[in-house]
Amino acid sequence: MTLASQIASDLLDIKAVYLKPEEPFTWASGIKSPIYTDNRITLSYPETRTLIENGFVKKIKEEFPEVEVIAGTATAGIPHGAIIADKMNLPFAYIRSKPKDHGAGNQIEGRVVKGEKMVVVEDLISTGGSVLDAVAAAEREGADVIGVVAIFTYELPKAEKNFAEAGVKLVTLSNYTELIKVAKVKGYITADGLQLLKKFKENQETWQD
């Protein structure tokens, strides 16, 4: 079993991911979606958490060997980022969604040295907008962001476009394609459900038609 399929399996088993193609969820954006993900739950399961953090360390060493600092996005990327930084013996910082409205007004907590090569950690990629905002904030502070890592991606075309336009490399441990494949094998969805889930990936607006 590959790392991507093992993580997909774990996410389903611990109910970090729910698949309901016949009774879709409504995302904050208004999109009707057959999938809902809350990867924060992974922190409560030591075996899954270890699998994820070791996976992150391996991927970062392979894809971004020149990394000098790890940063987590607030709030979901913070615990994973801190664990990764500890395992890799690297400095850690975290990036708020917006600057504090009191005190020094920091958006980044932790020391960012100008020109340091940074990898930003996120738990989930939908459109990529929030993590790319975090990347931009880090770069304004002088960091050289060399990539983003995340546990899971919905593989939405908008995310691919956003990362390409930003010129930021994205590496994820697992993905939507792998997850729905594993879900069918493990009996979490029917054959009809699988077809609906495939249609959602192709077009988020018309998949129910």
From Swiss-Prot:
Quick one: a GO biological-process term for this protein? 'de novo' UMP biosynthetic process
Q: Where are the transmembrane segments?
A: none
Domain of life from the UniProt record:
Bacteria
Reactions it catalyzes:
orotidine 5'-phosphate + diphosphate = orotate + 5-phospho-alpha-D-ribose 1-diphosphate
* Family in the record: Belongs to the purine/pyrimidine phosphoribosyltransferase family. PyrE subfamily.
Fetch the PANTHER family from UniProt: OROTATE PHOSPHORIBOSYLTRANSFERASE (PTHR19278), URIDINE 5'-MONOPHOSPHATE SYNTHASE (PTHR19278:SF9)
Designated name of the protein: Orotate phosphoribosyltransferase
The protein's organism comes out as Streptococcus thermophilus (strain ATCC BAA-491 / LMD-9)
Tell me the gene name.
Answer: pyrE
